Curated annotation (Swiss-Prot):
Top-level lineage group: Bacteria
The protein's name: Formate--tetrahydrofolate ligase
EC number: 6.3.4.3
InterPro entries: Formate_THF_ligase, Formate_THF_ligase_CS, P-loop_NTPase
Keyword flag ATP-binding: yes
Lineage: Bacteria, Bacillati, Bacillota, Bacilli, Bacillales
HAMAP family: FTHFS (MF_01543)
PROSITE patterns on file: FTHFS_1, FTHFS_2
Organism, as annotated: Staphylococcus haemolyticus (strain JCSC1435)
Amino acid sequence: MAHLSDLDIANQSELKPIGEIAEKAGIPADALEQYGHYKAKIDINQIKPKDNKGKVVLVTAMSPTPAGEGKSTVTVGLSDAFNELKKNVMVALREPALGPTFGIKGGATGGGYAQVLPMEDINLHFNGDFHAITTANNALSAFIDNHIHQGNELGIDVRRVEWKRVLDMNDRALRHVNVGLGGPTNGVPREDGFNITVASEVMAILCLARNINDLKEKISRITIGYTRDRKPVTVADLKVEGALAMILKDAIKPNLVQTIEGTPALVHGGPFANIAHGCNSILATETARDLADIVVTEAGFGSDLGAEKFIDIKAREAGFEPSAVVLVATVRALKMHGGVAKDDLKEENVEAVKAGIVNLERHVNNIRKFGVEPVIALNAFIHDTDAETEAVKAWAKENNVRIALTEVWEKGGKGGVELANQVLEVIEQPNDFKFLYDLDQSLEEKIETIVKDIYGGSSVTFSKKAKKQLKEFTDNGWGQYPICMAKTQYSFSDDATALGAPTDFDITIRELEAKTGAGFIVALTGAIMTMPGLPKKPAALNMDVTEDGHAVGLF
Protein backbone atom coordinates (compact mmCIF):
# COMPACT_ATOMS: atom_id res chain seq x y z
CA MET A 1 0.00 0.00 0.00
CA ALA A 2 1.41 3.38 -1.01
CA HIS A 3 1.76 5.94 1.77
CA LEU A 4 1.29 9.66 1.28
CA SER A 5 4.41 11.79 1.63
CA ASP A 6 4.70 14.17 4.57
CA LEU A 7 4.20 17.07 2.19
CA ASP A 8 1.06 15.49 0.69
CA ILE A 9 -0.38 14.94 4.17
CA ALA A 10 0.45 18.52 5.13
CA ASN A 11 -1.16 19.89 1.98
CA GLN A 12 -4.33 17.86 2.58
CA SER A 13 -4.65 19.04 6.18
CA GLU A 14 -7.10 21.80 7.02
CA LEU A 15 -5.46 24.53 9.05
CA LYS A 16 -7.37 26.64 11.54
CA PRO A 17 -6.92 30.42 11.51
CA ILE A 18 -4.06 31.26 13.85
CA GLY A 19 -6.41 33.43 15.93
CA GLU A 20 -8.37 30.29 16.86
CA ILE A 21 -5.18 28.50 17.88
CA ALA A 22 -4.16 31.49 20.00
CA GLU A 23 -7.56 31.55 21.68
CA LYS A 24 -7.29 27.82 22.44
CA ALA A 25 -3.87 28.42 24.01
CA GLY A 26 -5.15 31.33 26.09
CA ILE A 27 -3.07 33.93 24.25
CA PRO A 28 -4.75 37.36 24.43
CA ALA A 29 -5.51 39.08 21.13
CA ASP A 30 -3.21 42.02 21.90
CA ALA A 31 -0.26 39.59 22.24
CA LEU A 32 -0.74 38.18 18.73
CA GLU A 33 1.21 39.58 15.78
CA GLN A 34 -0.08 37.72 12.71
CA TYR A 35 2.13 36.74 9.77
CA GLY A 36 -0.64 35.83 7.33
CA HIS A 37 -3.50 33.47 8.19
CA TYR A 38 -1.64 30.60 9.89
CA LYS A 39 1.46 32.02 11.57
CA ALA A 40 2.04 34.60 14.26
CA LYS A 41 4.57 35.98 16.67
CA ILE A 42 3.78 36.46 20.33
CA ASP A 43 4.50 39.61 22.32
CA ILE A 44 5.59 37.93 25.53
CA ASN A 45 5.09 41.16 27.49
CA GLN A 46 1.34 40.62 27.07
CA ILE A 47 1.44 37.09 28.54
CA LYS A 48 0.70 37.00 32.25
CA PRO A 49 3.21 34.80 34.12
CA LYS A 50 1.61 32.16 36.30
CA ASP A 51 2.87 30.82 39.61
CA ASN A 52 2.09 27.17 38.92
CA LYS A 53 3.94 26.81 35.63
CA GLY A 54 3.43 23.92 33.24
CA LYS A 55 5.54 20.78 33.54
CA VAL A 56 8.23 20.11 30.95
CA VAL A 57 8.41 16.80 29.09
CA LEU A 58 11.73 16.46 27.25
CA VAL A 59 11.93 14.22 24.17
CA THR A 60 15.37 12.87 23.27
CA ALA A 61 16.63 9.78 21.45
CA MET A 62 19.12 6.96 21.16
CA SER A 63 22.11 7.50 18.83
CA PRO A 64 20.45 8.06 15.45
CA THR A 65 20.84 6.78 11.92
CA PRO A 66 21.65 9.47 9.31
CA ALA A 67 17.92 9.71 8.48
CA GLY A 68 16.94 10.46 12.08
CA GLU A 69 14.63 8.43 14.32
CA GLY A 70 11.54 10.65 14.29
CA LYS A 71 12.17 12.64 17.45
CA SER A 72 10.27 15.68 16.15
CA THR A 73 7.48 13.37 14.97
CA VAL A 74 7.17 11.79 18.42
CA THR A 75 7.33 15.21 20.10
CA VAL A 76 4.45 16.49 17.98
CA GLY A 77 2.51 13.22 18.22
CA LEU A 78 2.88 13.11 22.00
CA SER A 79 1.48 16.62 22.32
CA ASP A 80 -1.47 15.58 20.13
CA ALA A 81 -1.93 12.50 22.33
CA PHE A 82 -2.16 14.71 25.42
CA ASN A 83 -4.70 16.75 23.46
CA GLU A 84 -6.65 13.52 22.85
CA LEU A 85 -6.65 13.00 26.62
CA LYS A 86 -8.08 16.53 27.09
CA LYS A 87 -4.91 17.86 28.70
CA ASN A 88 -3.94 21.53 28.42
CA VAL A 89 -0.78 21.08 26.34
CA MET A 90 1.57 22.98 24.05
CA VAL A 91 4.52 21.73 22.02
CA ALA A 92 7.75 23.76 21.79
CA LEU A 93 10.13 22.96 18.93
CA ARG A 94 13.20 24.31 17.19
CA GLU A 95 12.97 25.96 13.79
CA PRO A 96 14.48 23.91 10.94
CA ALA A 97 17.69 25.19 9.35
CA LEU A 98 17.48 25.84 5.63
CA GLY A 99 20.88 24.31 4.79
CA PRO A 100 20.17 20.76 6.00
CA THR A 101 16.72 20.91 4.37
CA PHE A 102 18.59 20.78 1.05
CA GLY A 103 21.09 18.22 2.38
CA ILE A 104 20.37 14.79 3.85
CA LYS A 105 17.36 15.14 6.10
CA GLY A 106 14.95 17.33 4.16
CA GLY A 107 12.35 19.16 6.22
CA ALA A 108 12.17 19.03 10.01
CA THR A 109 8.59 19.62 11.14
CA GLY A 110 7.68 16.09 12.17
CA GLY A 111 6.26 13.50 9.82
CA GLY A 112 3.17 11.63 8.71
CA TYR A 113 0.15 12.66 10.75
CA ALA A 114 2.31 14.21 13.48
CA GLN A 115 3.48 17.46 11.91
CA VAL A 116 3.49 21.16 12.65
CA LEU A 117 1.98 23.35 9.95
CA PRO A 118 2.27 25.25 7.63
CA MET A 119 5.08 22.82 6.81
CA GLU A 120 6.37 24.59 3.68
CA ASP A 121 6.68 27.97 5.39
CA ILE A 122 8.35 26.60 8.52
CA ASN A 123 10.93 24.62 6.53
CA LEU A 124 11.82 27.48 4.20
CA HIS A 125 11.88 31.05 5.55
CA PHE A 126 9.19 30.95 8.25
CA ASN A 127 8.90 34.33 10.02
CA GLY A 128 12.41 35.49 9.18
CA ASP A 129 14.18 34.67 12.46
CA PHE A 130 17.17 32.93 10.87
CA HIS A 131 17.65 35.80 8.44
CA ALA A 132 17.67 38.27 11.35
CA ILE A 133 20.18 36.12 13.24
CA THR A 134 22.38 35.83 10.14
CA THR A 135 22.17 39.60 9.61
CA ALA A 136 23.04 40.41 13.22
CA ASN A 137 25.98 38.00 13.14
CA ASN A 138 27.34 39.42 9.89
CA ALA A 139 26.70 43.02 10.94
CA LEU A 140 29.06 42.34 13.85
CA SER A 141 31.66 41.05 11.37
CA ALA A 142 31.24 44.27 9.38
CA PHE A 143 31.63 46.38 12.53
CA ILE A 144 34.81 44.48 13.47
CA ASP A 145 36.43 44.90 10.06
CA ASN A 146 35.38 48.54 9.90
CA HIS A 147 36.92 49.21 13.31
CA ILE A 148 40.19 47.65 12.18
CA HIS A 149 40.11 49.61 8.91
CA GLN A 150 39.34 52.92 10.65
CA GLY A 151 42.46 52.91 12.82
CA ASN A 152 41.91 49.97 15.18
CA GLU A 153 41.67 52.00 18.38
CA LEU A 154 41.11 48.83 20.43
CA GLY A 155 44.28 47.22 19.08
CA ILE A 156 42.50 44.12 17.76
CA ASP A 157 44.99 41.53 16.53
CA VAL A 158 43.82 40.62 13.01
CA ARG A 159 45.38 37.17 13.51
CA ARG A 160 43.14 36.56 16.53
CA VAL A 161 39.68 37.63 15.40
CA GLU A 162 37.52 34.74 16.64
CA TRP A 163 34.21 35.95 15.22
CA LYS A 164 33.16 34.34 11.94
CA ARG A 165 30.53 35.19 9.40
CA VAL A 166 27.55 32.82 8.98
CA LEU A 167 25.16 31.59 6.31
CA ASP A 168 22.07 29.39 6.62
CA MET A 169 23.40 26.96 4.04
CA ASN A 170 25.63 23.88 3.91
CA ASP A 171 28.60 25.33 2.01
CA ARG A 172 32.00 23.74 2.66
CA ALA A 173 33.74 26.14 0.25
CA LEU A 174 33.23 28.97 2.75
CA ARG A 175 34.87 27.30 5.77
CA HIS A 176 38.10 29.22 5.22
CA VAL A 177 38.20 32.51 3.29
CA ASN A 178 40.33 35.63 3.04
CA VAL A 179 38.70 39.04 3.40
CA GLY A 180 39.91 42.60 2.88
CA LEU A 181 41.73 41.83 -0.37
CA GLY A 182 42.03 44.29 -3.26
CA GLY A 183 43.99 47.18 -1.80
CA PRO A 184 43.75 49.67 1.10
CA THR A 185 40.25 50.90 0.27
CA ASN A 186 38.82 47.40 0.80
CA GLY A 187 39.89 46.94 4.40
CA VAL A 188 42.68 45.08 6.15
CA PRO A 189 43.39 41.60 4.74
CA ARG A 190 42.89 38.74 7.19
CA GLU A 191 41.80 35.13 7.35
CA ASP A 192 38.13 34.54 8.06
CA GLY A 193 35.54 31.82 7.62
CA PHE A 194 31.85 31.00 7.69
CA ASN A 195 29.85 28.86 10.09
CA ILE A 196 26.29 27.73 9.47
CA THR A 197 23.78 30.08 11.11
CA VAL A 198 22.63 27.48 13.64
CA ALA A 199 26.19 27.41 15.04
CA SER A 200 26.27 31.19 15.51
CA GLU A 201 26.63 32.47 19.05
CA VAL A 202 23.85 34.92 18.20
CA MET A 203 21.54 31.92 17.73
CA ALA A 204 22.58 30.51 21.10
CA ILE A 205 22.07 33.89 22.78
CA LEU A 206 18.61 34.32 21.27
CA CYS A 207 17.69 30.88 22.60
CA LEU A 208 19.06 31.54 26.11
CA ALA A 209 17.86 35.13 26.59
CA ARG A 210 14.98 35.86 28.98
CA ASN A 211 13.95 39.22 27.49
CA ILE A 212 15.26 42.01 25.27
CA ASN A 213 17.46 43.48 28.02
CA ASP A 214 18.98 40.08 28.76
CA LEU A 215 19.53 39.64 25.01
CA LYS A 216 21.39 42.94 24.84
CA GLU A 217 23.47 42.12 27.92
CA LYS A 218 24.45 38.72 26.56
CA ILE A 219 25.36 40.22 23.17
CA SER A 220 27.59 42.77 24.91
CA ARG A 221 29.59 39.93 26.51
CA ILE A 222 30.49 38.25 23.20
CA THR A 223 34.27 37.89 22.83
CA ILE A 224 35.05 38.81 19.22
CA GLY A 225 38.82 38.37 19.43
CA TYR A 226 41.95 39.45 21.26
CA THR A 227 44.39 42.33 21.33
CA ARG A 228 48.04 41.86 20.47
CA ASP A 229 48.77 41.28 24.16
CA ARG A 230 46.05 38.59 24.37
CA LYS A 231 43.38 40.65 26.15
CA PRO A 232 39.78 39.74 25.17
CA VAL A 233 37.83 42.24 23.08
CA THR A 234 34.04 42.22 23.47
CA VAL A 235 31.02 43.65 21.70
CA ALA A 236 30.72 46.07 24.62
CA ASP A 237 34.15 47.45 23.65
CA LEU A 238 32.81 48.09 20.13
CA LYS A 239 29.63 49.64 21.61
CA VAL A 240 27.31 47.97 19.08
CA GLU A 241 25.20 45.71 21.33
CA GLY A 242 22.23 48.06 20.96
CA ALA A 243 22.35 47.94 17.17
CA LEU A 244 22.63 44.15 17.13
CA ALA A 245 19.76 43.72 19.60
CA MET A 246 17.67 46.06 17.46
CA ILE A 247 18.11 43.75 14.46
CA LEU A 248 16.74 40.92 16.63
CA LYS A 249 13.81 42.81 18.21
CA ASP A 250 11.21 40.77 16.31
CA ALA A 251 13.21 37.54 16.04
CA ILE A 252 13.21 37.24 19.85
CA LYS A 253 9.43 36.83 19.86
CA PRO A 254 8.28 33.17 19.81
CA ASN A 255 6.41 31.92 16.73
CA LEU A 256 2.95 30.37 17.07
CA VAL A 257 1.76 27.68 14.64
CA GLN A 258 -0.29 24.47 14.99
CA THR A 259 -0.07 20.72 14.64
CA ILE A 260 -2.22 18.83 12.13
CA GLU A 261 -4.64 18.14 15.01
CA GLY A 262 -4.75 21.77 16.15
CA THR A 263 -2.43 21.61 19.16
CA PRO A 264 -0.79 25.02 19.70
CA ALA A 265 2.90 24.92 18.83
CA LEU A 266 5.68 27.39 19.60
CA VAL A 267 8.53 27.00 17.10
CA HIS A 268 11.46 29.24 17.95
CA GLY A 269 15.24 29.13 17.62
CA GLY A 270 17.24 26.31 16.10
CA PRO A 271 20.78 25.57 17.30
CA PHE A 272 22.15 22.17 16.25
CA ALA A 273 22.94 19.73 19.06
CA ASN A 274 26.18 18.36 17.60
CA ILE A 275 27.86 21.77 17.15
CA ALA A 276 25.74 23.94 19.46
CA HIS A 277 23.41 23.46 22.45
CA GLY A 278 20.53 21.97 20.46
CA CYS A 279 17.43 23.38 22.19
CA ASN A 280 14.62 25.74 21.30
CA SER A 281 14.44 29.11 23.05
CA ILE A 282 13.95 29.55 26.77
CA LEU A 283 11.42 32.26 25.90
CA ALA A 284 9.26 29.84 23.91
CA THR A 285 9.46 27.13 26.58
CA GLU A 286 8.68 29.55 29.41
CA THR A 287 5.86 31.17 27.45
CA ALA A 288 4.37 27.71 26.89
CA ARG A 289 4.73 26.96 30.61
CA ASP A 290 2.74 30.12 31.38
CA LEU A 291 -0.04 28.99 29.04
CA ALA A 292 -0.22 25.19 29.35
CA ASP A 293 -0.13 22.53 32.07
CA ILE A 294 2.18 20.29 30.01
CA VAL A 295 4.89 21.46 27.61
CA VAL A 296 6.42 18.87 25.28
CA THR A 297 9.79 19.89 23.89
CA GLU A 298 12.82 18.23 22.30
CA ALA A 299 16.59 18.47 22.21
CA GLY A 300 18.63 17.49 19.18
CA PHE A 301 20.12 14.09 18.33
CA GLY A 302 20.77 11.55 21.10
CA SER A 303 20.64 12.02 24.86
CA ASP A 304 24.45 12.24 24.94
CA LEU A 305 24.20 15.55 23.06
CA GLY A 306 20.83 17.31 23.18
CA ALA A 307 19.49 16.04 26.50
CA GLU A 308 22.76 16.60 28.36
CA LYS A 309 22.92 20.17 27.03
CA PHE A 310 19.21 20.76 27.68
CA ILE A 311 19.79 19.93 31.33
CA ASP A 312 23.28 21.29 31.97
CA ILE A 313 22.94 24.45 29.85
CA LYS A 314 19.31 25.38 29.08
CA ALA A 315 17.49 24.13 32.19
CA ARG A 316 20.28 25.44 34.42
CA GLU A 317 20.04 28.89 32.79
CA ALA A 318 16.23 28.95 32.81
CA GLY A 319 15.79 27.56 36.31
CA PHE A 320 13.44 24.67 35.54
CA GLU A 321 13.76 20.90 35.31
CA PRO A 322 12.13 18.24 33.13
CA SER A 323 9.38 16.32 34.89
CA ALA A 324 9.73 13.42 32.44
CA VAL A 325 12.08 12.35 29.65
CA VAL A 326 10.93 10.42 26.58
CA LEU A 327 13.66 8.41 24.84
CA VAL A 328 12.87 7.74 21.17
CA ALA A 329 14.13 4.41 19.84
CA THR A 330 13.57 2.66 16.52
CA VAL A 331 14.04 -0.88 15.32
CA ARG A 332 16.18 0.36 12.43
CA ALA A 333 18.55 2.29 14.71
CA LEU A 334 18.87 -0.74 16.97
CA LYS A 335 19.74 -2.89 13.95
CA MET A 336 22.33 -0.35 12.82
CA HIS A 337 23.96 -0.41 16.26
CA GLY A 338 23.73 -4.20 16.11
CA GLY A 339 25.95 -4.27 13.02
CA VAL A 340 23.50 -4.18 10.10
CA ALA A 341 24.56 -2.19 7.04
CA LYS A 342 22.50 0.86 6.10
CA ASP A 343 21.14 -0.78 2.93
CA ASP A 344 19.88 -3.81 4.87
CA LEU A 345 17.99 -2.03 7.67
CA LYS A 346 14.59 -2.87 6.18
CA GLU A 347 15.23 -6.63 6.46
CA GLU A 348 14.10 -8.47 9.59
CA ASN A 349 16.99 -9.22 11.94
CA VAL A 350 15.92 -9.89 15.51
CA GLU A 351 19.42 -10.82 16.67
CA ALA A 352 20.78 -7.49 15.42
CA VAL A 353 18.00 -5.68 17.28
CA LYS A 354 19.01 -7.47 20.48
CA ALA A 355 22.69 -6.70 19.85
CA GLY A 356 21.94 -3.00 19.27
CA ILE A 357 20.06 -2.62 22.54
CA VAL A 358 23.40 -1.85 24.24
CA ASN A 359 23.16 1.63 22.71
CA LEU A 360 19.63 2.18 23.98
CA GLU A 361 20.57 0.82 27.39
CA ARG A 362 23.35 3.37 27.80
CA HIS A 363 20.96 6.20 26.90
CA VAL A 364 18.49 4.89 29.51
CA ASN A 365 21.24 4.84 32.14
CA ASN A 366 22.36 8.33 31.13
CA ILE A 367 18.88 9.78 31.67
CA ARG A 368 18.75 8.11 35.08
CA LYS A 369 22.00 9.87 36.03
CA PHE A 370 20.02 13.13 35.96
CA GLY A 371 17.58 11.67 38.47
CA VAL A 372 14.73 11.27 35.97
CA GLU A 373 13.09 8.00 34.92
CA PRO A 374 12.87 7.72 31.11
CA VAL A 375 9.99 6.38 29.05
CA ILE A 376 11.05 4.69 25.80
CA ALA A 377 8.96 5.63 22.77
CA LEU A 378 9.47 2.79 20.32
CA ASN A 379 8.71 4.76 17.17
CA ALA A 380 7.07 2.41 14.67
CA PHE A 381 8.22 2.23 11.04
CA ILE A 382 6.39 0.32 8.31
CA HIS A 383 9.21 -2.21 7.83
CA ASP A 384 9.35 -3.22 11.52
CA THR A 385 8.23 -6.77 12.25
CA ASP A 386 6.33 -8.02 15.30
CA ALA A 387 9.28 -10.19 16.31
CA GLU A 388 11.66 -7.20 16.28
CA THR A 389 9.25 -5.02 18.24
CA GLU A 390 8.61 -7.75 20.81
CA ALA A 391 12.36 -8.21 21.33
CA VAL A 392 12.67 -4.58 22.42
CA LYS A 393 9.59 -4.77 24.63
CA ALA A 394 10.85 -7.96 26.28
CA TRP A 395 14.20 -6.32 27.10
CA ALA A 396 12.44 -3.29 28.57
CA LYS A 397 10.16 -5.43 30.74
CA GLU A 398 13.06 -7.55 31.93
CA ASN A 399 15.04 -4.44 32.89
CA ASN A 400 12.13 -2.50 34.43
CA VAL A 401 12.17 0.26 31.81
CA ARG A 402 8.95 1.93 30.75
CA ILE A 403 8.19 1.51 27.03
CA ALA A 404 5.32 2.32 24.68
CA LEU A 405 4.93 1.42 21.03
CA THR A 406 4.36 4.77 19.35
CA GLU A 407 2.44 5.00 16.08
CA VAL A 408 1.93 8.75 15.73
CA TRP A 409 3.38 8.88 12.19
CA GLU A 410 0.51 6.70 10.98
CA LYS A 411 -2.25 7.53 13.46
CA GLY A 412 -1.51 11.00 14.82
CA GLY A 413 -2.35 11.64 18.47
CA LYS A 414 -4.32 8.40 18.83
CA GLY A 415 -1.10 6.51 18.10
CA GLY A 416 0.60 8.14 21.09
CA VAL A 417 -2.00 7.69 23.82
CA GLU A 418 -0.19 4.74 25.43
CA LEU A 419 3.00 6.83 25.56
CA ALA A 420 1.11 9.84 26.95
CA ASN A 421 -0.43 7.78 29.74
CA GLN A 422 2.98 6.40 30.72
CA VAL A 423 4.44 9.93 30.75
CA LEU A 424 1.56 11.16 32.91
CA GLU A 425 2.39 8.48 35.48
CA VAL A 426 6.04 9.61 35.56
CA ILE A 427 5.06 13.28 35.86
CA GLU A 428 3.02 12.54 38.97
CA GLN A 429 5.91 10.80 40.69
CA PRO A 430 8.68 12.68 42.52
CA ASN A 431 12.13 12.52 40.98
CA ASP A 432 15.65 13.17 42.19
CA PHE A 433 16.67 15.68 39.52
CA LYS A 434 20.29 16.79 39.46
CA PHE A 435 22.82 18.29 37.08
CA LEU A 436 25.72 16.21 35.80
CA TYR A 437 28.39 18.55 37.16
CA ASP A 438 28.82 21.65 39.30
CA LEU A 439 29.78 24.91 37.65
CA ASP A 440 32.59 25.46 40.14
CA GLN A 441 34.43 22.41 38.79
CA SER A 442 37.28 23.24 36.42
CA LEU A 443 36.67 23.24 32.67
CA GLU A 444 38.85 20.14 32.38
CA GLU A 445 36.89 18.33 35.10
CA LYS A 446 33.56 19.17 33.50
CA ILE A 447 34.70 17.86 30.11
CA GLU A 448 36.06 14.68 31.69
CA THR A 449 32.80 14.15 33.58
CA ILE A 450 30.77 14.31 30.36
CA VAL A 451 33.16 11.98 28.52
CA LYS A 452 33.34 9.38 31.28
CA ASP A 453 29.82 9.51 32.75
CA ILE A 454 27.75 10.10 29.60
CA TYR A 455 29.83 8.86 26.67
CA GLY A 456 31.41 5.88 28.47
CA GLY A 457 34.94 6.94 27.56
CA SER A 458 37.98 6.22 29.68
CA SER A 459 40.08 9.34 29.09
CA VAL A 460 40.33 12.75 27.46
CA THR A 461 43.31 14.02 25.49
CA PHE A 462 43.67 17.76 25.09
CA SER A 463 45.66 19.01 22.11
CA LYS A 464 48.47 21.47 22.70
CA LYS A 465 46.17 24.27 21.56
CA ALA A 466 43.32 23.10 23.81
CA LYS A 467 45.63 22.90 26.86
CA LYS A 468 46.73 26.46 26.24
CA GLN A 469 43.12 27.58 25.88
CA LEU A 470 42.12 25.86 29.13
CA LYS A 471 44.60 28.05 31.00
CA GLU A 472 43.75 31.22 29.06
CA PHE A 473 40.00 30.79 29.51
CA THR A 474 40.37 30.09 33.22
CA ASP A 475 42.66 33.11 33.64
CA ASN A 476 40.06 35.23 31.84
CA GLY A 477 37.42 34.23 34.40
CA TRP A 478 35.50 31.86 32.15
CA GLY A 479 36.11 28.69 34.17
CA GLN A 480 32.62 28.76 35.71
CA TYR A 481 30.84 28.27 32.38
CA PRO A 482 29.11 24.99 31.45
CA ILE A 483 30.47 22.87 28.60
CA CYS A 484 28.93 22.47 25.15
CA MET A 485 30.51 19.46 23.47
CA ALA A 486 30.80 19.50 19.66
CA LYS A 487 30.79 15.83 18.73
CA THR A 488 29.45 13.42 16.15
CA GLN A 489 25.84 12.41 16.79
CA TYR A 490 26.27 8.88 15.48
CA SER A 491 28.46 7.47 18.25
CA PHE A 492 29.11 7.96 21.94
CA SER A 493 32.75 8.43 20.95
CA ASP A 494 34.30 11.00 18.59
CA ASP A 495 34.51 8.29 15.91
CA ALA A 496 31.25 8.20 13.93
CA THR A 497 31.86 4.57 12.95
CA ALA A 498 32.10 3.29 16.55
CA LEU A 499 28.48 2.22 16.93
CA GLY A 500 26.70 0.42 19.75
CA ALA A 501 28.09 1.26 23.19
CA PRO A 502 31.89 1.55 22.86
CA THR A 503 34.04 1.53 26.00
CA ASP A 504 37.65 2.25 26.94
CA PHE A 505 38.05 4.93 24.30
CA ASP A 506 39.81 8.27 24.41
CA ILE A 507 38.23 11.49 23.18
CA THR A 508 40.49 14.19 21.79
CA ILE A 509 39.61 17.84 22.37
CA ARG A 510 41.27 19.61 19.48
CA GLU A 511 40.28 23.15 20.50
CA LEU A 512 37.94 25.20 22.64
CA GLU A 513 35.74 28.18 21.78
CA ALA A 514 34.66 30.72 24.38
CA LYS A 515 31.01 31.68 23.87
CA THR A 516 31.07 34.31 26.61
CA GLY A 517 27.85 35.93 25.41
CA ALA A 518 25.84 32.72 25.49
CA GLY A 519 27.74 31.67 28.59
CA PHE A 520 29.30 28.33 27.70
CA ILE A 521 32.55 26.85 26.41
CA VAL A 522 32.44 24.76 23.23
CA ALA A 523 34.80 21.77 23.17
CA LEU A 524 35.46 20.61 19.61
CA THR A 525 36.16 16.89 19.17
CA GLY A 526 37.21 14.74 16.24
CA ALA A 527 36.53 16.13 12.79
CA ILE A 528 33.28 17.92 13.68
CA MET A 529 32.62 20.92 11.41
CA THR A 530 30.70 24.10 12.26
CA MET A 531 29.97 24.60 8.55
CA PRO A 532 28.55 21.39 7.05
CA GLY A 533 28.80 20.37 3.41
CA LEU A 534 26.19 18.90 1.10
CA PRO A 535 26.13 15.16 0.26
CA LYS A 536 26.84 13.85 -3.24
CA LYS A 537 23.12 13.60 -3.92
CA PRO A 538 21.48 16.35 -1.86
CA ALA A 539 17.76 16.31 -1.11
CA ALA A 540 17.56 19.44 -3.28
CA LEU A 541 17.69 17.20 -6.38
CA ASN A 542 14.14 16.06 -5.60
CA MET A 543 12.73 19.52 -4.92
CA ASP A 544 10.72 21.80 -7.15
CA VAL A 545 7.94 24.36 -7.09
CA THR A 546 4.67 24.03 -9.01
CA GLU A 547 3.11 26.65 -11.25
CA ASP A 548 0.74 27.66 -8.45
CA GLY A 549 3.63 28.13 -6.02
CA HIS A 550 3.51 24.91 -3.97
CA ALA A 551 6.73 23.18 -2.92
CA VAL A 552 7.56 19.67 -4.10
CA GLY A 553 10.00 17.29 -2.39
CA LEU A 554 10.07 18.67 1.16
CA PHE A 555 9.38 15.08 2.36
